[in-house]
Every structure is written in structure tokens, then in C-alpha cells.
């Protein structure tokens, strides 16, 4: 199964306030993110993280936290992602800025474009290719895009799957 999520903002205390997250502190936020992630994702699954995994965490703490998240993790880099530490980078099967993939449900295949940022126009958009992105944190501009926002707050701090994307 493929899962999609964005804007975890681990170790970013201000994200609790500016994103109006329902957590008292970082410890509660991290505990809940890990719990919801590992309840849903299995080790054989792939999770596409559409950017902003963390912002101010010490690398040791960040590495330890990301390492316990189940699944094969693909990072579509966002504006807060620093992957210069090889130990951290190795937690991801791939790190890129933009990715085109196919996902399927009930034998039907769909094209998806994955990027941290919303894009005004993308490959095969007129043929129904789905754009998944993060970054905007439910801003009013989201209404202008034929899209699916995968930001943590927008998806109730859990992951999207292709069936839920198709319902949007």
C-alpha cells in the first residue's frame, strides 16, 4: 500500500501554534504522530513524505524518531528538509524534489505528481493526473489548485491513500 503525507514538522514547537495542532507540546505531538503512523503503515508499505519532516531537531533525536516510523520512506524534499547528514538521508529509500508515480486501486491505475509545493500546471493534468502537495497548511490559496493537500493538519495527522484521494 502507498501512503502520502506532508508537513510533519517534527521538533518544530511553533508548528503546534501556527498550524493550530491539537497537542500540548512536542512530546505529545511526536507520540501521537508515531502512534497513528505505525498503526496504519506496515513495513512493506511505501510512505511518500511530501516535505518538511522536521525543522529544528537535533540530528540524533530526529534520526531516532524517523527510524521507528514503519514503511519504506520516500522524501520529496520541502523547504525545511536538511538531508546533509548521511545517517538521516539513509532513512529514506529516495530523496528528490519532485516525483511522478503510478498508484492503483481495484485494478485501475492513476498517475500522481508529488511535490512539496503546489504547482500551477503539471504533466498530464488535463488527463486527470493528480497533484499531491504540502507546504501551504490549509491556506486560502489551496482553492485555486486541482489538487489534494497532504499536509498533516488537512489529513487529521494521519496518511492519505489513493482511495481517500479519489474521494476528494
Region roles according to the model:
Residues 102-124:
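Core dinuclear metal-dependent hydrolase active-site scaffold
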Residues 2, 46, 112, 130-132:
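Structural motif
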Residues 98-100, 139-157:
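Flexible, gly/pro- and Lys/Arg-enriched active-site loops
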Residues 2-103:
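Core catalytic region of metal-dependent phosphoesterases/phosphodiesterases
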Residues 2-9, 111-117, 154-156:
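Active-site-proximal beta-strand elements of phosphoester/diester hydrolases
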Residues 79-83, 117-120, 136-139:
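Short, polar loop motifs at secondary-structure junctions
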Residues 158-164:
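Conserved small/polar residues in nucleotide/adenosyl-binding loops
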Residues 8, 114, 129-140:
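Histidine-centered catalytic micro-motifs
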Amino acid at each position: 500500500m502507498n501512503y502520502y503525507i506532508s508537513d510533519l514538522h517534527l521538533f518544530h514547537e511553533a508548528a503546534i501554534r501556527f498550524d493550530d495542532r491539537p497537542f500540548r507540546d512536542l512530546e505529545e505531538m511526536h507520540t501521537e504522530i508515531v502512534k497513528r503512523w505505525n498503526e496504519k503503515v506496515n513495513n512493506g508499505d511505501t510512505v511518500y513524505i511530501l516535505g518538511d519532516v522536521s525543522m529544528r531537531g537535533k540530528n540524533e533525536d530526529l534520526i531516532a524518531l524517523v527510524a521507528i516510523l514503519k514503511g519504506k520512506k520516500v522524501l520529496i524534499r520541502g523547504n525545511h528538509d536538511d538531508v546533509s547528514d548521511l545517517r538521516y538521508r539513509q532513512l529514506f529509500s529516495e530523496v528528490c524534489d519532485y516525483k511522478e508515480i503510478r498508484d492503483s486501486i481495484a485494478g485501475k491505475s492513476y498517475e500522481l505528481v508529488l511535490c512539496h509545493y503546489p504547482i500551477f500546471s503539471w504533466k498530464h493534468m488535463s488527463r486527470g493526473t493528480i497533484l499531491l502537495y504540502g507546504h501551504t497548511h490549509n491556506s486560502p490559496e489551496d482553492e485555486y489548485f486541482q489538487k489534494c493537500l497532504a499536509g498533516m493538519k488537512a489529513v487529521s495527522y494521519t496518511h492519505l491513500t489513493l482511495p481517500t484521494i479519489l474521494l476528494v
